[in-house]
Regions:
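Hydrophobic core residues within well-ordered beta-strands of beta-rich domains
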Residues: 162, 223-225, 239
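SH3/SH3-like beta-barrel fold
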Residues: 178-179, 243
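Glycine/charge-rich catalytic "coupling/switch" loops of P-loop NTPases
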Residues: 147, 182-233, 257-284
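Short beta-strand segments
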Residues: 63, 164, 183-187, 225, ...
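Short, conserved beta-turn/loop elements at beta-strand boundaries and strand-helix junctions
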Residues: 171-174, 232-238
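C-terminal boundary and immediately downstream tail of ABC-type ATPase nucleotide-binding domains
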Residues: 147-177, 202, 273
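ABC ATPase nucleotide-binding domains
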Residues: 1-4, 8, 12-156
Length: 284
């Protein structure tokens, strides 16, 4: 079968050099061509000068490149990647992501990537398939899935934290009205759902914003909400801010310099706006 496979643990032959590992995928070629082809593929994945090293003489990222070169050397019709980047450090993983994207475009081959890493999936995928216990829950482009999950289960698997239950009150000319506890929120139209039904709804952390400074207008679908800061969690250049509103937990991300500018502190009450154009409702 013309299928290339790249495994999480690389599966390199420990007694063979990088060049010979790649050559193992070329046994259907004349012996005189194998080494030249193997060296060419190693060069394509930026392993020039490392052809004769054994796997234990290579870093994890270099071993991964050897395995990728071996998978591609057979010029497969499809490439299957089984969590191939989970065993390397972040900087190496980012470099491999870029190289894989370039190779995929160059060879125009379909790639099936199995991963638990949402960031990796959204970065590399043209289409995503959400699987749970052997069942397909939803397929589509990364943007479509993130903006319009079909169920709360899909939203949770996509890492969304702000998932709630509410009631779709009515449809207006350019928006719908959503009842959430004692608040009425204006959201983008959801005319496929009947007014009066109970719904699940989600808002991404990027859809929860600090109220703008005085004089800066919002949008027609901004929903001002008073919230209490429960916890500030440092994530490097930004904070994850855990909030509480009407007894419900709510999360947003705030850049570190913005948090410092607003002097955010745990326990204080602040005003945020829920961007109605980012709110997505689903049948309950």
């Amino acid at each position: 079968r013309r299928i290339g496979m790249l495994f999480q643990q690389f599966a390199l032959f420990p007694h063979l050099s990088a060049e010979d590992n790649v050559a193992e995928a070329l046994l259907d070629h004349p012996a005189t061509e194998r080494r030249a082809r193997a060296r060419d593929w190693l060069d394509r994945v930026h392993l020039q000068g490392l052809h004769h090293r054994l796997p234990h003489q290579l870093s994890g990222g270099q071993q991964q490149r050897v395995a990728l070169a071996r998978a591609l050397a057979r010029e497969p019709q499809v490439l299957l990647l089984d969590e191939p980047f989970s065993a390397v450090d972040r900087s190496t993983r980012e470099a491999l992501h870029a190289e894989l994207t370039e190779l995929r475009v160059a060879f125009r081959m379909p790639v099936i990537l199995v991963t638990h890493d949402l960031e990796e999936a959204t970065l590399l995928a043209d289409r995503m398939c959400i699987l749970n216990e052997g069942r397909t829950l939803q397929t589509g482009s990364p943007d479509h899935l993130l903006q319009s999950p079909e169920s709360a289960a899909v939203a949770r698997m996509l890492g969304m934290r702000n998932i709630f239950t509410g009631t779709l009150l009515a449809h207006e000319a350019d928006h719908s009205l959503l009842r959430w506890n004692d608040l009425t929120l204006k959201v983008r139209p959801h005319r496929h759902l009947p007014a009066g039904c109970e719904v699940k709804w989600v808002i991404p952390v990027s859809g929860v914003l600090l109220m703008p400074l005085a004089g800066r207008p919002g949008t027609p679908l901004d929903n001002p909400v008073s919230v209490r800061i429960q916890r500030l969690l440092s994530l490097g250049e930004q904070y994850r801010v855990n909030l509480e509103s009407t007894g419900q937990p709510l999360s947003m991300n705030v850049a570190r310099h913005v948090a410092q500018r607003y002097k955010l502190t745990e326990g204080e009450t602040i005003e945020v706006r829920l961007r109605g154009e980012t709110i997505h409702m689903m049948a309950n």
